[in-house]
């Protein structure tokens, strides 16, 4: 008979099952994104997942690690999925391949693999692509109700691999809405228009007519919110990070909007547009690169929320989730150091 030593804990959940649950929780948001922006989103996800699995398998083989066993943890699958849904649906195929390979090989495996990476791999891949190819990374189609030329599955496939539809239209022509005006994401559109128009006039534009967060985008964010609530219910993630993230972002947006409503976006636009809910529930909560203490998670999430608001308002990019997460990842060792819970019976030491 063997006697086990303490601590006596029991957890039936494996890394594989948690990763799979997170992947399943992404489905509502992916469905909404596919409905409003076409099949390109699904194609990007498929390309990213295939690249992630192949890149991870190749590195594991070179490191003489058990390839099939390690691939079964589903972490590469999740990294590819998160990066795939973050890219514009009709971005060239080589971009998603390059970004995913960089995320897996450099941002994850170079540090030792799962559990060793200090930065979120998917966001590292995204930022590398955004800095290297800013035009392609901001070339989103208009949402379905505003599309001048709806794009089917075959045209999406052709555009991703050749740059043109079967009728010869390129991405710039597909970006033109039904009103003949080239469309952008709500955050990008708001940021650009604010240079010459007041907020009230901007919110009268077609992309905002179905809601303050922009046509389609509020439904995508609601989809990821639903998936995030599922993760909280199943206790796959801690509540501290998403709650503090959203409260900090909403607080900054609300204060600025109340002080200068003609110059700042309303809180609803910040909360339900861009990658807000995806970032709050699926990216910032990465257990490897996030803070590990309860107070640390609150600080970590709030820091991301504040940084997202600062980048969106004062930065050069319309959405700042990826940069905010990576900047907060840098602060994790410091946050964890100063938020370690005090051991019962011991006083906090001073050095």
Curated annotation (Swiss-Prot):
Cellular component, GO, one term: plasma membrane
Function: Part of a membrane-bound complex that couples electron transfer with translocation of ions across the membrane.
Family affiliation: Belongs to the NqrB/RnfD family.
Pfam families cross-referenced by the UniProt entry: NQR2_RnfD_RnfE
EC supergroup of this enzyme: translocase
Spans through the membrane: 18-38, 42-62, 87-107, 121-141, 212-232, 241-261, 264-284, 298-318, 320-340
Protein name: Ion-translocating oxidoreductase complex subunit D
Keywords per UniProt: Cell inner membrane, Cell membrane, Electron transport, Flavoprotein, FMN, Membrane, Phosphoprotein, Translocase, Transmembrane, Transmembrane helix, Transport
E.C. designation(s): 7.-.-.-
Quaternary context: The complex is composed of six subunits: RnfA, RnfB, RnfC, RnfD, RnfE and RnfG.
Gene name in the database record: rnfD
